[in-house]
Structures are given as C-alpha cells and as structure tokens.
Regions:
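Extended, compositionally biased flexible segments
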Residues: 1-102
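Catalytic-pocket segment enriched in acidic/His residues
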Residues: 2-22, 33, 37-45, 106, ...
C-alpha cells in the first residue's frame, strides 16, 4: 500500500544515555493539578476529577533549541511540568497497577498563548489555538523508570533569564501520576507512545522574544529553551 502524499515524520523524544528514541503518539495535559496554580488561575483547588486537553504529537521539540516567538500572541506563558511517558497500553487501569504502564519521565513545558486561551474561555470555545500550536511542548530526553524509579516528591522549578518564576514540589500534585493514568484510561485507551504532562505549579507568567527558560525536576533532568530575539523570521509555507 502506498500513500497519496508523503507520510508525516514520526515525532520522537531522545532516551537519555542511549541512541534510541521514544515515538510520540498523543500528548495529554492535566489542567490545574497543583493547588497554588489553581488559585492563581481563579479556581478552588479541591479534588474534583482532573480534566485534560491535548497538544499535537509534533508539538514536541528537544531541550536546547532556540525557537521563534509564536505567531498571533502577545502573551506567551511558561508552564513547567513533569512528563510521563507511557510504555504499555491499557484501559480501565487500576491505580495500584498504573505505574507499571510508565516507560519513563522527562521535564517539559506546556507553552501557552494565554491571550488566545482567555479569548476562547470568554467565548466558551475550545482552547486549541492557545495550547496546541507549533513547538509548544519542549521536552528533555526521557529517563526510564527502570533507572530512576517513579518520582513522587522533589523540587520542580522554572527560571526566566536566571530568575526563579515557578517553584513547587511534586508532592503538591492534587492527582498523583498513578491516579491520573487510572482516571484517563477510563475515557480513552492509553497506548505506548502517549505522553501525559501532569500539571504545573504556581508562578506561570509571560516570556518574551530573547528570553532563556530553564526548567528542572529533581531526579529527572534539566530543560533549556531560548526564544529568538525579536525580528527572527518564522518559516513560511
């Protein structure tokens, strides 16, 4: 069988310490999973069921990249997150077995065009243009859980131009990784290659052209992204 157009390139993430890569199938993001962040966004951080939104698989971009400032926004925000890479699929996964489905972990950014997201919220429309744009998901190489275990506590932070903007601890997650996996698997079949970004701590805020972003999760890794100086050309069709 042949395709009528060239097949899209398979998005993938490096696996730390190897020449292998992890193919990305889908990207799920958990909304408001740290109490302080929920409050700063104007919500009550109780244990309501988590909610999810998606980014396209090809939104992933490797740590270390210099990126063009995204189009159509004047309010680009950073959100540092623990990235969970699914290595074994399943549906209705029990909480007690959920971590068996994890291949490994990374550090990622849920970059957000906050002005477009807010416009969509005000109009009661979907968030895709605010969340699901090109290169909106920088990610570090993944570390297999077989080597680092399953991080449930430890510092998670983000700096902009050397100044700490976000600071939290993984133990502040309202929904732990295993709970998120179990709940999401009730609605969709999880498959190898799925990523889950498990929420961001307080301190989300704007970044501009020329800014350097540095993120960290204890025991998982360090992420660095730079936005090109103002005037850098975006690739045209």
């Amino acid at each position: 069988m042949s395709y009528v157009i060239p097949a899209p390139k398979q998005p993938a993430i490096a696996v730390a310490g190897t020449d292998a890569t992890f193919p990305v199938r889908r990207i799920w993001c958990v909304g408001r999973n740290y109490a302080d962040h929920a409050r700063e966004m104007g919500h009550d951080p109780n244990r309501e069921p988590p909610f999810f939104f998606q980014k396209p698989a090809d939104a992933v971009v490797a740590s270390g990249a210099t990126l063009p400032y995204p189009a159509m926004t004047k309010d680009l925000h950073h959100e540092i997150e623990l990235v969970v890479a699914i290595g074994k699929g399943g549906v209705n996964v029990p909480v007690a077995k959920a971590l068996d489905h994890v291949f490994g972990y990374g550090v990622g950014l849920d970059m957000t065009r906050r002005d477009l997201q807010q416009q969509a919220k005000d109009l009661k429309r979907p968030w895709e243009m605010g969340k699901s744009f090109d290169q909106s998901c920088p990610v570090t190489p993944l570390h297999p859980a077989a080597k680092i275990g399953h991080p449930a506590q430890g510092s998670i932070w983000l700096k902009v131009n050397g100044e700490v903007k976000q600071q939290g601890d993984l133990n502040q997650q309202i929904w732990r990784v295993e709970e998120t996996i179990a709940y999401l698997s009730q609605f969709v079949a999880l498959e190898p290659g799925d990523l889950i970004l498990n929420g961001t701590p307080a301190g989300v805020g704007p970044c501009k052209a020329g800014d350097k972003l540095e993120g960290h999760v204890d025991g998982v890794g360090d992420l660095v992204i730079t936005y090109a100086a103002e005037g850098a050309a975006r690739k045209a069709a």
